[in-house]
A protein has these predicted regions:
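Non-catalytic pre-domain segments flanking phosphatase-related domains
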Residues: 1-25, 29-33, 37-40, 44, ...
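Mg2+-dependent phosphoryl-transfer enzymes with acidic/Ser/Thr/Gly-rich catalytic loops
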Residues: 2-4, 16, 174, 181-251
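Residue-level signal for inorganic ion chemistry
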Residues: 27, 82, 134, 182, ...
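Active-site phosphate-binding/coordination module
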Residues: 40-127
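Substrate-recognition/cap helix-loop segment adjacent to the acidic, metal-dependent catalytic center
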Residues: 67-83, 142-161
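Substrate-recognition "cap/lid" segment bordering the active-site pocket of phosphatases
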Residues: 85, 91-111, 163-193
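Charged, glycine-interspersed solvent-exposed loop segments at helix/strand-loop junctions
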Residues: 115, 124-140, 162-172
Length: 251
């Protein structure tokens, strides 16, 4: 596989009104913390996002695995378009779309996993309604062990899929991902007919990269991973903020 090139704002057209910007949150806008709850609101980041959104005529969206409630807690802004739970929740300035068809099964899976992982220290099980996330960043549990446990449960659910991320495993609807979220926004104003940029850092962002590539946009992974669909990369979170700073200087 071809190694991705370093992303730079110089690759973009001078008129940023032609662009639509999609941003992951954890590992992209924020450094990854030991627990999702440790991420706190940042006024400077909120102001920066709002300014870029205004420059883009509103064509900026957050594409995250977090729930909408959690994203609202962090960003304190209902004007920015948001996709939560890996595309199972979508909100633009006009409407909210939410996929909850499997929420009952998610609750049952959460109970089963809690029983099977009972006694395992530093494992956080997060039921997000349409999705279920198991965080084990601070645990000594073997990744293969927890992966096997969750696969055994999910394999009997044809409408659900197990997604592996950085020190997390997520059970989510098969029909929704970050790629479908980006496609949804690209069919609506003010994103329509623009060229997309998507910046993310994890395996969970690969569907988004693939979608953006098909639409002739710029797919950017934080960290240079050879096994990625992203065409470009940025070395770290700091470099993402540098790109945002440069966008603020654009016309």
């Amino acid at each position: 596989m071809k190694v991705a090139s370093v992303f730079t704002v110089k690759l973009l057209p001078k008129d940023i009104q032609q662009l639509a910007l999609f941003l992951d949150v954890d590992g992209t806008l924020y450094e990854i913390e030991n627990s999702p709850s440790l991420i706190k609101p940042c006024f400077k980041l909120q102001k920066k996002l709002q300014t870029i959104r205004n420059r883009l005529g509103g064509a900026l969206a957050l594409i995250s695995g977090r729930s909408l409630d959690d994203l609202d807690r962090i960003f304190e802004n209902d004007k920015i378009s948001v996709a939560g739970n890996h595309g199972a929740q979508l909100r633009d300035t006009l409407r909210l779309k939410e996929y909850q068809a499997e929420s009952g099964k998610i609750k049952g899976i959460a109970y089963k996993i809690s029983e099977l992982l009972n006694g395992k220290k530093n494992i956080e099980i997060e039921n997000k309604g349409s999705n279920l996330t198991v965080h084990f960043r601070n645990s000594t549990i073997d990744r293969k062990e927890i992966n096997k446990i969750m696969l055994e449960i999910v394999k009997y659910e044809p409408k659900l899929i197990l997604l592996e991320g950085k020190e997390v495993l997520e059970v989510k609807p098969l029909s929704h991902n970050k790629g479908t979220a980006i496609s949804y926004f690209m069919r609506t104003k003010p994103f329509i007919k623009r060229r997309p940029i998507f910046i993310g850092d994890d395996v969970t962002d690969e569907d988004g990269f693939e979608t953006v590539n098909k639409k002739g946009g710029w797919s950017v992974r934080v960290g240079n991973y050879k096994r990625s669909k992203a065409k470009f990369f940025l070395p770290n979170v700091k470099s993402v903020h540098e790109v945002m700073k440069q966008l603020l200087k654009s016309r």
